[in-house]
Curated annotation (Swiss-Prot):
<dbReference type="GO" id="GO:0003746">
    <property type="term" value="F:translation elongation factor activity"/>
</dbReference>
<dbReference type="GO" id="GO:0005737">
    <property type="term" value="C:cytoplasm"/>
</dbReference>
<dbReference type="InterPro" id="IPR008991">
    <property type="entry name" value="Translation_prot_SH3-like_sf"/>
</dbReference>
<keyword id="KW-0648">Protein biosynthesis</keyword>
<protein>
    <recommendedName>
        <fullName>Elongation factor P</fullName>
    </recommendedName>
</protein>
<dbReference type="InterPro" id="IPR013852">
    <property type="entry name" value="Transl_elong_P/YeiP_CS"/>
</dbReference>
<keyword id="KW-0963">Cytoplasm</keyword>
<dbReference type="Pfam" id="PF09285">
    <property type="entry name" value="Elong-fact-P_C"/>
</dbReference>
<dbReference type="InterPro" id="IPR015365">
    <property type="entry name" value="Elong-fact-P_C"/>
</dbReference>
<dbReference type="InterPro" id="IPR014722">
    <property type="entry name" value="Rib_uL2_dom2"/>
</dbReference>
<comment type="similarity">
    <text>Belongs to the elongation factor P family.</text>
</comment>
<dbReference type="Pfam" id="PF08207">
    <property type="entry name" value="EFP_N"/>
</dbReference>
<dbReference type="InterPro" id="IPR020599">
    <property type="entry name" value="Transl_elong_fac_P/YeiP"/>
</dbReference>
<dbReference type="Pfam" id="PF01132">
    <property type="entry name" value="EFP"/>
</dbReference>
<dbReference type="InterPro" id="IPR001059">
    <property type="entry name" value="Transl_elong_P/YeiP_cen"/>
</dbReference>
<comment type="pathway">
    <text>Protein biosynthesis; polypeptide chain elongation.</text>
</comment>
<dbReference type="InterPro" id="IPR011768">
    <property type="entry name" value="Transl_elongation_fac_P"/>
</dbReference>
Length: 190
C-alpha cells in the first residue's frame, strides 16, 4: 500500500532501498523556507542497522502490511525459544535475542503475537502485563511511609525492578512488560 512520506508513523514497516525498515521515530518538520518533510529514524528489520531519512510530503513509499498471528510459548531449548501456532499447530523457533530482554517474562502456555511478512517473523508482542513472584526484596525501613519511595527487588526470572516498600519476597505481583515497572500486588483471594 502506497502512503505519502508525511504519513509515516512509528511502528510502520516500509520498503525502502530494496529492504524492509521499521520506523522508530518520526518528526514532522516545517521549515520557514522550502517544503515540509518528515524526518524518520529507520531500523532495518533484517540486520538491525539504523538510518535517518527525510521524506517529503509529496513522495510516496510502500507501506508493508504485516500479518499478525497468535502463538503459544512452549519451551526454551538453549538460546532457542519454541512457539506453536494456535491455528495450525506448527512450531516456530526464534532466537532469544530476537525477543530481547522481555524473553525473561515468557511463561509456559503464554500467548504472544508474532508479526510476519511472507511467513518470516519480524516482531513479537508479549502481553502488556504478567504475574511474577519476587525472589528477593530489601526489608522495608520504618519511617519511610511519608514519602513515596520504592525499593529494589529481584524477580524469579532475574529481572530487577523497583517495588513499593510493603512488597516482600515470595509475593506475586503484576509487572508491565513494556516499561518493566511494578503495577500492583496480586490479591490472595484469587
Amino acid at each position: 500500500m502506497k502512503i505519502n512520506g508525511n504519513e509515516i508513523r512509528p511502528g510502520n514497516v516500509i520498503e525502502h532501498q530494496g529492504s524492509l525498515w521499521v520506523a522508530v521515530k518520526c518528526n514532522a518538520v516545517k521549515p520557514g523556507k522550502g517544503g515540509a518533510f518528515n524526518q524518520v529514524e529507520l531500523k532495518n528489520v533484517i540486520d538491525g542497522t539504523k538510518l535517518n531519512e527525510r521524506f517529503r510530503a509529496a513522495e510516496t513509499v510502500e507501506k508493508v502490511r504485516l500479518e499478525q498471528k497468535d502463538f503459544t510459548f512452549l519451551y526454551q531449548q538453549g538460546e532457542a525459544l519454541v512457539f506453536m501456532d494456535t491455528e495450525s499447530y506448527e512450531q516456530l523457533e526464534l532466537q532469544r535475542d530476537f525477543v530481547g530482554d522481555r524473553a525473561a517474562f515468557l511463561q509456559d502456555g503464554m500467548t504472544v503475537t508474532v508479526e510476519l511478512h511472507e511467513e518470516k517473523p519480524l516482531g513479537i508482542s508479549l502481553p502488556d502485563q504478567v504475574t511474577v513472584t519476587i525472589a528477593e526484596a530489601d526489608p522495608a525501613i520504618k519511617g519511610q511511609t511519608v514519602t513515596s519511595s520504592y525499593k529494589p527487588a529481584i524477580l524469579e526470572n532475574g529481572i530487577r525492578i523497583l517495588v513499593p516498600p510493603f512488597v516482600q519476597a515470595g509475593e506475586r505481583i503484576i509487572v508491565d512488560t513494556n516499561e518493566l515497572t511494578y503495577i500492583r500486588r496480586v490479591s490472595e483471594k484469587g
